[in-house]
Amino acid sequence: MNDSLKAQCIAEFLGTGLFLFFGIGCLSALKVAGASLGLWEICIIWGLGISLAVYLTAGISGAHLNPAITIALWLFACFPGRKVLPYTVAQVAGAFGGALLAYLLYGSLFTEYESAHQMVRGSLESLHLASIFSTYPAAALSVWQAALVEVVITSILMGMIMALTDDGNGVPKGPLAPLLIGILVAVIGASTGPLTGFAMNPARDFGPKLFAWMAGWGDVAMTGGRDIPYFIVPIVAPIIGACAGAAIYRYLIGKNLPCNTCKLDENES
């Protein structure tokens, strides 16, 4: 690994860890510290956390912070394939680190909450606290319905990210783009969060799930109490969704932008 790629992976690690720390810290404050936070407030904190992480890392790594985005950019936006695996490892490790850091600060409150509610860590009931770290679907949703939700919302996320960062699209760029991406995440979360927790990111979900598994929640953290282990859904569905969103933007929007139309006309002549 050369120095440039190493720096990019470090940036991805730190950026992913940063927004996970903010998000998990927010949910910890809500569930074990008694903070009064509504759905929109939670989504805004997640969104602003992502905006700050993008501001931190965009100049070094491009601020992917999400393996699904990395894979989609590789397939549809000329991102080098040799960087996909290192970026993904860095993102998952960063998400694990963000979860660990938040737990180190809130750990005693977790223990106090479990004692007060006679909750055994690793039981199905303990998913209430495991969901602080990663996402699980609403009880009324099947695994397949949850997968569909994640495909749809990740495709929207990816398509809009490409629109917001496309130099030919005529929308605000530079310092506004990270903030707009954060608002996008908050809007998606506010509209669909109660369904699946709006994972949209394999690293965001699997890294903290792995931490929860190691921290005593065990198999229930991975399965979510479902017959089909739920951890598979936030890995596979966001990748499918991101690729779909990138393809839709590239072939239905991007190629029809004026700058690209001119290039096509020049090539044809």
Swiss-Prot record:
Q: Name one Pfam family in it.
A: MIP
PROSITE patterns associated with the record: MIP
Annotated Gene3D superfamilies: Glycerol uptake facilitator protein
Q: Which GO terms describe its cellular component?
A: plasma membrane
Q: Which InterPro entries match?
A: Aquaporin-like, MIP, MIP/Aquaporin, MIP_CS
Q: Which Gene Ontology molecular function entries are recorded, alphabetically?
A: glycerol channel activity
Among SUPFAM superfamilies, the record links this protein to: Aquaporin-like (SSF81338)
As annotated in the record, motif NPA 1 runs over 66-68
Q: Where is this motif: NPA 2?
A: 201-203
Q: Which PANTHER family match?
A: AQUAPORIN OR AQUAGLYCEROPORIN RELATED, AQUAPORIN-9
- Protein name per the record: Propanediol uptake facilitator PduF
Q: Which gene encodes it?
A: pduF
